């Protein structure tokens, strides 16, 4: 019941923000935060590079890394023309940015992709570690953002504690952190 209420709350928040437009920028890997910093300085723009928690074997700690390397997500109530103007004024010539679009004027993110992204990430735009157990050689998530998404897990790497998800998102394969509870 709690999960259903949580999903419903996220859906309502998404519907309340229908006047927001989502954009996807492609940039150089490792320059995502630099691009976000510039974009956030512009009024009416929220930019982020999603992160994910993962288990680092050497340090034996949960750490953060970029979920989609080279991608920056922008949310704004500004029009496409206004946002394009801000993108074109990007001051750092050494950092390449390119807006991804399906067609001339259609953002590269579908409503379904936006819904998935907002459901899985927390308010800090981090996909938190999930926890689960093995049942019949298949992982069953009991805690975390992947609860009730067992059917989307197509592979589990026990050694690195990473699950591969069968989600269509920017033609990327989702590898997310899942730790087995012993």
Q: Residue locations for each model-derived region?
A:
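Acidic-enriched and Gly/Ser
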Residues: 2, 8-135, 155, 164-182
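Generic structural signal for buried aliphatic residues
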Residues: 137-139
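Short, surface-exposed secondary-structure boundary micro-motifs
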Residues: 144-145
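Short beta-strand-centered aromatic/proline hotspots
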Residues: 149-155
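A generic structural signal for beta-strand entry/edge sites
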Residues: 160-162
């Amino acid at each position: 019941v709690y999960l259903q209420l949580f999903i419903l709350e996220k859906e309502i928040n998404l519907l309340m923000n229908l006047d927001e437009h989502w954009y996807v920028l492609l940039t150089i890997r490792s320059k995502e935060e630099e691009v976000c910093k510039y974009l956030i300085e512009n009024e009416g723009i929220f930019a982020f590079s999603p992160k994910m928690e993962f288990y680092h074997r050497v340090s034996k700690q949960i750490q953060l890394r970029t979920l989609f390397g080279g991608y920056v997500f922008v949310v704004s109530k500004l029009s496409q023309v206004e946002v394009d103007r801000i993108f074109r004024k990007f001051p750092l010539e050494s950092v390449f940015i390119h807006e991804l679009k399906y067609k001339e004027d259609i953002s590269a993110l579908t409503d379904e992709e936006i819904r998935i992204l907002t459901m899985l990430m927390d308010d800090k735009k981090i996909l938190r570690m999930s926890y689960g157990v093995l049942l019949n050689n298949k992982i069953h998530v009991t805690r975390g953002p992947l609860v009730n998404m067992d059917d989307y897990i197509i592979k589990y790497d026990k050694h690195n504690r990473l699950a591969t998800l069968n989600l269509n998102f920017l033609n990327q394969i989702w590898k997310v952190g899942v730790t087995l509870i012993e």
